[in-house]
Amino acid sequence: MGLELYSKVEEYFDFQDEVKLLHATFLGLIFEKNLDDIIDIGCGQGAFIMHLLANGVNAYGIDLSVEQIKICQAYDLNADVLSLAEVNEKFNCATAIFDVINYIPKNDVEQFFKDTSRVLNDDGYFLFDVNSFFGFEEVAEGSLNIDIDDKFIGIDAIFEEDKLKTDITLFSKTKNNLYKKEEGRITQYYHDIQFLKTSILNAGFEIENILDFNFHTEEEADKLIFICKKK
């Protein structure tokens, strides 16, 4: 329920500039490596796939959210409701952008990386970002209320014990001028850099580089971008 509810309210969050810069950064890496035939894991509504296609790069997307994939398919994008473990094709590059890895519990991360390796050709690349501790504690935590037209959205995010728990409340006006209430929670997990390095190496990748991604301040990175290559 949490992710499906999030898909209904995501467009009202002020993430556009950050996502635009993040997508531009990933596109730059893809052009630099001259990569094609890409699987975008956790593709959401398909914005990054659209950027890839607009630049002549073949792309396929998967997501666990039915609502998100409906939007992808409405745009005639090649995307399916699938878990990574269900994918049988091979690709030259995999991307997981805007917190995808942070939605995976620590005990499942290494298997996720192994599943990613399985769907890549030899020497294929895996590009992903993760939130830094600063990104969770100083940027993501907090409360937000959005009151627009026929909707009221309440967000309350608390970061403790390496978990960001975000409670979402949505009130939607019905035809009878009544309000329908929906509630859900999404949980994200902080993964420290040493844990990620170990998990990536165990999954059969080498790490070419780890980049700082600074959006809110130049002093501390909001996210880290990992550039990994299948051995």
Give, region by region, the residue ranges found by the protein language model.
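Conserved class I S-adenosyl-L-methionine
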Residues: 1-33, 35-42
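Class I SAM-dependent methyltransferase SAM/SAH-binding core
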Residues: 46-85
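A short acidic, Gly/Pro-enriched loop at the edge of an enzyme's catalytic core
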Residues: 85-94
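A short glycine-rich, Lys/Arg-flanked "PGG" loop and its adjoining helix->strand segment in the class I
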Residues: 110-122
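Conserved beta-strand signature within the Rossmann-like core of class I S-adenosyl-L-methionine
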Residues: 123-130
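SAM-dependent methyltransferase
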Residues: 130-197
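Core SAM-dependent methyltransferase catalytic element
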Residues: 219-231
